[in-house]
Design a protein with these regions (language model features):
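Nucleotide-activated chemistry modules centered on ATP-dependent adenylation/adenylyltransferase
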Residues: 1-259
Length: 259
């Protein structure tokens, strides 16, 4: 398990320098002010909902909001969506993170036929994850969801955050984006300062790759760009699958994000 203590002792090793820098930044007044604002947003959200959940799949952003949400509402349920095509170290990390977080959680698979999509026999199930989670939320009377959405990730998300704000209501209930103004590094800071388990994928890039572009869940293209060389370097067994997926989906075609 990668934690702050381990990073402090191994900061000179490949892939850990930028994480060590994050740990230093986490002690600054600027970061502490952002943390206060994020917690204030959560306080507002929890004051208007009765049966909320926190969406957390083990990535840096969802880990950050899970940690912060549990500070405000210790018994809020963690909702974890499980893809059929995870990277090899995701499962162990998610289990470790959920153990560390403690409290109630639910894991919800959203299966689709990866082989048929790669073969071109079926279309990529755009929006399946959202549909499955929405159905589960409706079935269980969920009236609000905390999400690890950040404006920095894309122009689409930036515009959405600007128009809706950090706490808003949709037809399916309330939404809270406590870290919408955080950078990727600031998201990691939350986990670092809590000494929470950190997805090992963040040590596999020698401190040179933008944290916004790292694949920390599945190997399917998701960033509107081409991470094939990164896959070849850090997950060579999955590079071929990623290349097939690029050919099926098309380079530069990022999945539509609805939140």
């Amino acid at each position: 398990m990668l934690t702050l203590k381990a990073i402090r002792g191994r900061a000179s090793e490949a892939g850990l320098k930028s994480l060590a820098d994050c740990a230093k930044y986490a002690r600054t007044l600027t970061f502490q002010r952002k943390m206060t604002k994020a917690l204030d947003r959560l306080e507002t959200f929890f004051s208007v909902v009765k049966n909320p959940v926190v969406s957390c799949g083990g990535g840096k952003d969802s880990t950050a909001v899970a940690i912060l949400a549990r500070q405000v509402s210790p018994h809020v349920t963690i909702m974890c969506a499980d893809p059929p095509n995870p990277l090899p170290d995701r499962e162990e990390h998610v289990k470790e993170l959920l153990r560390w977080l403690g409290g109630p959680y639910v894991r919800i698979p959203y299966p689709w036929d990866v082989e048929k999509v790669l073969a071109g026999e079926e279309a990529y199930p755009e929006g399946l994850k959202i549909r499955v989670l929405s159905a589960w939320q409706k079935e269980h009377g969920v009236d609000g969801v905390v999400l690890g959405i950040r404006a920095e990730e894309s122009k689409r998300r930036s515009l959405a955050v600007r128009s809706r704000g950090a706490v808003y209501q949709m037809s399916g209930g309330w939404r809270c984006l406590p870290i919408c103004d955080f950078t990727a590094e600031e998201s990691l800071c939350v986990a670092l300062m809590s000494d929470a388990p950190i997805n090992p994928v963040y040590t596999r890039q020698d401190g040179t790759l933008d944290f916004n572009r790292i694949h920390d869940g599945t190997w399917w293209p998701h960033d509107g760009g081409d991470s094939l060389e990164w896959m070849r370097t850090w997950y060579p067994d999955y590079a071929g699958l990623y290349a097939q997926a690029l050919a099926v989906q098309g380079e530069g075609c990022a999945p539509i994000c609805v939140f």
